[in-house]
């Protein structure tokens, strides 16, 4: 019994360690990045033809007066006709605060903060080179709206050069979607071939993530290549070394809690992914596509997709089979993915995320019931063996080797596995951690209500009722399990304090996770009563 108590304590503390370690290793906020001189020189070498990280950022509000406003059922976008950059993106179906009407704004420029998406054509005949400056497009209107019954909205920006080449930058919006098609149509009406190369980049002022120990979040960049499915590239990484990754297809992104912006170039195109950081603290991640030759009299379209919205796994997977990995479940992703699927399935049935979490808990506990029963049977047998084990200790005294051999023979004779009570606990720990990351990373749970005072399962209980109930249930479970009479007094005190320690620990956990743990405890108490009643009939106490 003593060994199982110790293992329970170790298992619970192990969870705490893993969560803390995960936060410390790659989630903790980092200070503002300092850019080394070597990195700046390398940046100039890689991206000498791409507009600098500071280019295209209006210094005053007056510079943004002629922005083009685009409104769909999902997005409110502002496009600067200089370069055709997306300088503002509000997500109309995601509120900034739960009980307010103001939408969540992902891309914006205000005060000393800038977060924009830029794209253009560079190369020999490009219109957006670092040397010549950004293209100045003309638009037929200053506002576009996706009308009722309309599924697609195109916003064309046009520029014709003195040589007779017409460049049309077309933004394509679709109903119900957060991805924006960006097409460059190059109509070469000149007498000479035109050579251009598309690029896209996301620029963001370096800021620390709004993170806490119980709610660790990542704010920074990420990318994917043909060889590397998903890799984070933090602001700190950018300051130390510029990225330069040639690949077929791929994507680049800027991540934050629940939301993402990403450039997804053509999958069949040869691209170079790159990063840079300006001396002013503006981080940049982007791609450069392959060179396109447009013959005289010909027209060619060069395309990429820009996503600006929530970390919706289905929507992201539709753009790239690896883009959904920005929903980062950590090292237990292989367990978190099916848990998320089960959670989504139950929610589709009951239309309440809290009830869905309860159903997931019942499912997990039901699947683990045979192991749970085996655990309590093993614990009961171990309790019955305590007098015989004490006799062995008295007989062999300090001869640990002989006493160990005698104990193993006794276990074999009585058909008792001393480790039999550990397996259910060890299995529940990964499930707990995986569910923690599901609740932390899944945007579906943002502002998701349960009932009564729990109106957002993704944040802590505002009145701490669930953590207190969880602590009480943990105390009740502990009282139901007989304490070994020969347990060390210090260990007894530690176990007695565990419910209170974990109550404090859970005060800042998301309410959804505390709900899972509370319901799990209540189910465990019920299972204990059933199993103990069965054991008493068999003469095991």
From Swiss-Prot:
The places in or outside the cell where this protein is found are: Cell inner membrane
Question: What keywords are assigned to this protein?
Answer: Cell inner membrane, Cell membrane, Chaperone, Membrane, Protein transport, Transmembrane, Transmembrane helix, Transport
List cellular component terms (GO).
Answer: plasma membrane
Q: How does it sit in the membrane?
A: Multi-pass membrane protein
Presence of keyword Acyltransferase: no
Q: Which Pfam families match?
A: 60KD_IMP, YidC_periplas
GO molecular function ontology, one term from the record:
membrane insertase activity
Q: Which GO BP annotation is one of this protein's?
A: protein transport
The job of this chain, per UniProt, is described as: Required for the insertion and/or proper folding and/or complex formation of integral membrane proteins into the membrane. Involved in integration of membrane proteins that insert both dependently and independently of the Sec translocase complex, as well as at least some lipoproteins. Aids folding of multispanning membrane proteins.
| Entry's family note | Belongs to the OXA1/ALB3/YidC family. Type 1 subfamily.
Quaternary structure note = Interacts with the Sec translocase complex via SecD. Specifically interacts with transmembrane segments of nascent integral membrane proteins during membrane integration.
Name the UniProt record assigns to this protein: Membrane protein insertase YidC
Taxonomic source organism: Shewanella amazonensis (strain ATCC BAA-1098 / SB2B)
The record lists the lineage as:
Bacteria, Pseudomonadati, Pseudomonadota, Gammaproteobacteria, Alteromonadales
Which gene carries the instructions for this protein? yidC
């Amino acid at each position: 019994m003593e060994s199982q108590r110790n293992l329970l304590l170790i298992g619970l503390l192990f969870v705490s360690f893993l969560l803390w370690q995960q936060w410390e290793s790659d989630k903790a906020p980092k200070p503002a990045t300092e850019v080394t001189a070597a990195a700046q020189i390398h940046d100039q070498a890689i991206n000498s033809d791409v507009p600098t990280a500071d280019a295209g950022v209006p210094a005053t509000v007056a510079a943004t007066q002629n922005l083009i406003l685009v409104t769909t059922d999902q997005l409110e976008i502002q496009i600067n006709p200089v370069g055709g950059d997306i300088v503002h993106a509000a997500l109309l179906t995601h509120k900034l605060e739960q009980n307010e009407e103001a939408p969540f704004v992902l891309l914006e420029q205000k005060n000393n903060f800038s977060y924009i998406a830029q794209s253009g054509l560079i190369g020999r005949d490009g219109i957006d080179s670092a040397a010549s400056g950004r293209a100045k497009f003309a638009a037929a209107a200053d506002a576009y709206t996706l009308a009722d019954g309309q599924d697609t909205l195109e916003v064309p920006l046009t520029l014709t050069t003195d040589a007779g080449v017409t460049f049309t930058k077309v933004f394509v919006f679709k109903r119900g979607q957060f991805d924006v098609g960006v097409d460059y149509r190059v109509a070469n009406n000149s007498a000479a071939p035109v050579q251009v190369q598309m690029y896209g980049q996301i620029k963001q002022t370096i800021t620390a993530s709004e993170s806490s120990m119980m709610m660790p979040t990542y704010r920074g960049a990420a990318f994917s290549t043909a060889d590397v499915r998903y890799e984070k590239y933090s602001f700190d990484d950018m300051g130390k070394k510029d990225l330069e990754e040639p690949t077929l297809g791929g994507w680049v992104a800027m991540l934050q809690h629940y939301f993402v912006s990403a450039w997804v170039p053509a999958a069949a195109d040869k691209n170079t992914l790159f990063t840079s950081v300006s001396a002013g603290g503006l981080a940049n991640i982007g791609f450069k596509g392959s060179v396109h030759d447009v013959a005289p009299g010909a027209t060619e379209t060069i395309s990429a997709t820009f996503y600006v919205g929530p970390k919706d796994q289905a929507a992201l997977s539709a753009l790239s089979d690896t883009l959904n990995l920005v929903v980062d479940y950590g090292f237990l992703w292989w367990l978190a993915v099916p848990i998320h699927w089960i959670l989504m399935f139950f929610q589709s049935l009951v239309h309440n995320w809290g009830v869905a979490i309860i159903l997931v808990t019942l499912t997990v506990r039901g699947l683990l019931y045979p192991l749970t029963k085996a655990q309590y049977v093993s614990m009961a047998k171990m309790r019955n063996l305590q007098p015989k084990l004490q006799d062995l200790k008295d007989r062999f005294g300090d001869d640990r080797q002989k006493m160990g051999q005698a104990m193993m023979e006794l276990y074999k004779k009585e058909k008792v596995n001393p480790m039999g009570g550990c397996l259910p606990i060890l299995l529940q720990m990964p499930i707990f951690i995986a569910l923690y990351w599901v609740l932390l990373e899944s945007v579906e749970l943002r502002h998701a209500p349960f009932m009564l005072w729990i109106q957002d399962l993704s944040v802590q209980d505002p009145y701490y009722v669930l953590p207190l109930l969880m602590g009480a249930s943990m105390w009740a479970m502990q009282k139901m399990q007989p304490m070994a009479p020969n347990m060390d007094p210090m260990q007894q005190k530690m176990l007695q304090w565990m419910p209170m320690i974990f109550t404090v620990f859970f005060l800042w956990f998301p309410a959804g996770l505390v709900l899972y743990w509370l319901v799990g405890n209540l189910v465990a108490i019920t299972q204990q009563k059933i199993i103990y009643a069965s054991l008493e009939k068999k003469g095991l106490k």
